[in-house]
Amino acid sequence: MNQLNSETVRWIKSKPLFLVALLVLVAGLVGWLLQGGQTQQTATQWPAPLAQLKPDFEVTQPLPAQLKLDGDKVALGARLFSDVRLSLDDTISCASCHVLSAGGTDNRYRSVGVNGGVGSVNAPTVLNSGFNFVQFWDGRAASLEAQVEGPVNHPKEMAANWPLVLSKLGKDAAYAAAFSKLYADGITATNIKDVIATFERSLITPNSRFDKFLQGNAAALTAPEKHGYELFQTYGCASCHQGVNLGGNMFEKMGLMGDYFADRGNVTEADNGRFNVNHNPESLHEFRVPSLRNVALTAPYFHDGNAATLEEAIAVMAKYQLGRAMPAKDLNDIAAFLRSLTGELAGQPL
């Protein structure tokens, strides 16, 4: 991984060492316990003075500038991502609910599909989704390829099926030529899923101001943003939101320190979360922790879209995940830090 640059290390060193050490140890222990004693990331090398601590999760690190992907697959996947012929009535594409210029979501409480069908959860961002350890809020898809399967067949999303999709795309000479160039068997459901997933893996958003800070530019963040990052760690947010994607690498129960669903009301089957997949009572109300990359652009928040603003989402997390009220200044500084996580897509600021 990329080590933190010397300027950032000096900023960390300016904080009391005992506090830094304590925070890292507590965050590591909490993250370990919440994952059932199993880590999903390996220990890594930290800069002094943290190297000797060897925490069980990777330090937050900048996104890579690019990944090594097949350019032809990326280009073909991009075309299909915006192709409405993947839907029953040629009205909905992947891009309908995952608007790349809007943070990879549609900024709706619920997405609307074919014939006005309304989904049961808030659409998660597609940006940086290749770094998630599973896909969907409930983690029912183990890969991006498996994720592509869901919307195509879902009656409230694209409401199609693969024979129909293959029939429509097979009549497109340009698609036929492009697939034949890449695959001996041409246009198949498996190959469509492969190119779309490859395109989705290319949707990384590096060069946020926070990335630049991690790379050594201590001036990339303002004083409130630096304080917000410090609070993000001291409050324990980093126990779940860490790694290169600041999330996306574990499940967590919604409402650790309070009954979120009883207070919100109108509980639905989708609120069961991971339980709907594995039917394990211990997984009730567990969801994949979302990435915080570009989070300022992806309102409304949570699987239910119930928080309209970033500040509201932070307050909800403080109450139901941490069991405490957060002073307004702390909340605002954490929000300022989170807004520094907005990056670039294909070299253009989001």
Each model region followed by its residue ranges:
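Post-cleavage N-terminal segment of exported redox proteins
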Residues: 2-74, 132, 150-226, 230, ...
